């Protein structure tokens, strides 16, 4: 399941409550073509990797979170463990997304 993040507080809360689990954050926008293309794959990964926390941040709805995380383009995927960023890449690259998850779990 992918959790939709709608505030800076909800983002921090989600990172904190994840504990030891890997957190994957998809920074996207409704008007972004590549974001729409990879979204179903991101959701399917959330079903496949039940021990990983998947979050989705709409950069237009949560500009403060996107700014704090220094997101420059969409889609950007960031990976967190114990509240610390441990990885990041931009672009709708399905293979890289799944490979990065496997590398970090």
From Swiss-Prot:
GO terms under biological process: positive regulation of DNA binding; response to radiation
Primary site of residence: nucleus
Catalytic residues in the record: 32 (nucleophile), 35 (nucleophile)
CC terms in the record's Gene Ontology section: cytoplasm; extracellular region; nucleus
Protein name: Thioredoxin
Modification type N6-acetyllysine: residues: 3, 39, 94
Pfam family, one: Thioredoxin
UniProt keyword annotations, A-Z: Acetylation, Activator, Cytoplasm, Disulfide bond, Electron transport, Nucleus, Redox-active center, S-nitrosylation, Secreted, Transcription, Transcription regulation, Transport
Role: Participates in various redox reactions through the reversible oxidation of its active center dithiol to a disulfide and catalyzes dithiol-disulfide exchange reactions. Plays a role in the reversible S-nitrosylation of cysteine residues in target proteins, and thereby contributes to the response to intracellular nitric oxide. Nitrosylates the active site Cys of CASP3 in response to nitric oxide (NO), and thereby inhibits caspase-3 activity.
PROSITE patterns membership: THIOREDOXIN_1, THIOREDOXIN_2
In-chain residues carrying the UniProt-annotated modification S-nitrosocysteine: 62, 69, 73
Quaternary organization: Homodimer; disulfide-linked. Interacts with TXNIP through the redox-active site. Interacts with MAP3K5 and CASP3. Interacts with APEX1; the interaction stimulates the FOS/JUN AP-1 DNA-binding activity in a redox-dependent manner.
GO molecular function: protein-disulfide reductase activity
Modified residues (N6-succinyllysine): 8, 94
Record-linked InterPro entries: Thioredoxin, Thioredoxin-like_sf, Thioredoxin_CS, Thioredoxin_domain
Provenance organism: Sus scrofa (Pig)
Tissues expressing this chain: Erythrocytes.
Record localization: Nucleus; Cytoplasm; Secreted
Site feature location: Contributes to redox potential value: 33-34
Domain of life: Eukaryota
Disulfide bonds: 32-35
Domain Thioredoxin: 2-105
